[in-house]
Swiss-Prot record:
Entry's localization field: Cytoplasm
Residues bound to IMP: 12-15, 37-40, 134, 148, 230, 245, 309
Gene3D superfamilies on file: Adenylosuccinate Synthetase, subunit A, domain 1 (3.40.440.10), Adenylosuccinate Synthetase, subunit A, domain 2 (1.10.300.10), Adenylosuccinate Synthetase, subunit A, domain 3 (3.90.170.10)
EC numbers, comma separated: 6.3.4.4
Spans traversing the lipid bilayer: none
Organism: Eremothecium gossypii (strain ATCC 10895 / CBS 109.51 / FGSC 9923 / NRRL Y-1056) (Yeast)
Designated name of the protein: Adenylosuccinate synthetase
Pfam families: Adenylsucc_synt (PF00709)
Cofactor(s) this protein requires: Mg(2+)
Residues annotated as binding substrate: 305-311
């Protein structure tokens, strides 16, 4: 059994909390895409654990965790995050954490060129806007992967006698091409190579052939949960390109990022914030640059875990959710942070776009169109009631249930979970047929 948790908007929907809720039922939690450019916080026993690259299944002592071949890995950050989790009392993590030998490596010069590329792009754009990169080197690493010049984990940990010499040669060649592209920039290649040589032995016990790992687990009928990173609207193909990440963040990326066939997938859970947020630049049709947006930002504490950047806020966009559902094939939804809407007298929901008076059929791929659309809203009554102490779905205020029903009816997918607060206990479950 392979079930998948995916973000349906622009990230920060609260995927980690659903994974944390479900993880006790699973034998394996796997990451299939991205790197340490995304983040979420899980609270267990009053302790906050921040996850960026590592699977959040580590909070379950009985769960194995895999970083798949579709993920890109900055090794110093990998060990830094692991050590921070261990310092907070997370035990036996090293024996339950595995890395695909086919995953690509992020180097410090990738991070440097990430920032140089951002400056270059913002200088060339007419409006001076940035893509909004986190500066973690993710994009440049996927770029070298696509150009077939990147280095993978197996290149680093190989025990073949000529392996290190070949690694060093490829590293220098890769650095040289980056410096030719962006001009000479300060980088201590000898220090980084020496550091990675030390990492070889420390990293080796974590490394597995992830294809063998996954297919053995499937044949043994292990229960596997795939933890998506980012969200569909940041997908390299289906997101608001170019204001996207550099990987496939939808269901397609799960298959290629773990090496499993579509027939292995059972359930696909779409995580949806009860309103909409995004970090960085790019069109955002339902954004509210007004009191409502400020209120959502303040009550929702909308700051990024990875970057600390303030998130832009707006009303729930059902055009986005329907588009995301079409591509990902969600079988049920988790609506998060419903409690943030508790004090709103009225709540707006975007249900369609139009341009020059003509209604659009679906979410447009052209950002020149997207930036000009008019949004049609439906106004629903609020519930003006604190729902954070409610423990059963049936006890939600009628207007809150009506809000959720409106979402279900619009996208044609049942809501199975509802988040009503930050704690792991603040998640209501609704039976779905």
């Amino acid at each position: 059994m392979v079930n998948v948790v995916l973000g349906s908007q622009w990230g920060d929907e609260g995927k980690g909390k659903l994974v944390d809720l479900l993880v006790s039922k699973y034998d394996i939690v796997a990451r299939s895409a991205g790197g340490n450019n995304a983040g979420h916080t899980i609270v267990v026993g009053g302790i906050k654990y921040d996850f960026h690259m590592l699977p959040s299944g580590l909070v379950n002592p009985n769960c194995q965790n895999l970083i798949g071949n579709g993920v890109v890995i900055h090794v110093p950050s990998f060990f830094g995050e692991l050590e921070q989790l261990e310092a907070k009392g997370l035990r036996d993590a090293r024996g339950r954490l595995f890395i695909s030998s086919r995953a690509h490596l992020v180097f410090d010069f990738h991070q440097r060129t990430d920032k140089l590329r951002e400056l270059e792009l913002s200088g060339k754009s007419k409006d001076g806007k940035n893509i909004g990169t986190t500066g973690k080197g993710i994009g440049p690493t996927y770029s070298t992967k696509a150009s077939r010049s990147g280095l993978r984990v197996h290149h680093l940990v190989s025990e073949q006698p000529e392996a290190w010499a070949e690694f060093e040669t490829k590293y220098r060649r890769l650095l040289e091409t980056r410096q030719q592209r962006y001009g000479p920039f300060e980088h201590d290649a000898e220090e980084e190579l020496a550091r990675y040589r030390r990492y070889r032995e420390e990293l080796r016990p974590f490394v597995v052939d992830s294809v063998v790992f996954m297919h053995n687990a499937i044949q043994q009928k292990k229960k596997i949960l795939v933890e998506g990173a980012n969200a569909l609207m940041l997908d390299i193909d289906f997101g608001t390109y170019p204001y996207v990440t550099s990987s496939s963040t939808g269901i397609g990326g799960v298959l290629t990022g773990l090496g499993i066939p579509p027939r292995c997938i059972d359930e696909i859970y779409g995580v949806v914030k009860a309103y909409t947020t995004r970090v960085g630049e790019g069109p955002f049709p339902t954004e509210q640059l007004n009191e409502a947006g400020d209120k959502l930002q303040t009550i929702g504490a909308e700051y990024g875990v990875t970057t600390g950047r303030k998130r832009r806020c707006g009303w729930l966009d059902l055009v986005v959710l329907k588009y995301s559902t079409l591509i990902n094939g969600f079988t049920s939804l988790n609506i998060t942070k419903l409690d943030v809407l508790d004090t709103f007298k009225e709540i707006k929901v975007g249900i369609s776009y139009s341009l020059n008076g003509k209604k659009l059929d679906l979410f447009p791929e052209d950002l020149l169109v997207l930036s000009k659309v008019d949004v049609e809203y439906v106004t629903l009554p609020g519930w003006d009631e604190d729902i954070t102490k409610i423990s059963r779905y049936e006890d939600l205020p009628e207007n809150a249930k009506s809000y959720l029903k409106f979402i279900e009816d619009f996208v044609g997918v049942p809501v199975e979970w509802v988040g009503t607060g930050p704690g792991r206990e603040s998640m209501l479950h609704k039976e779905v047929s």
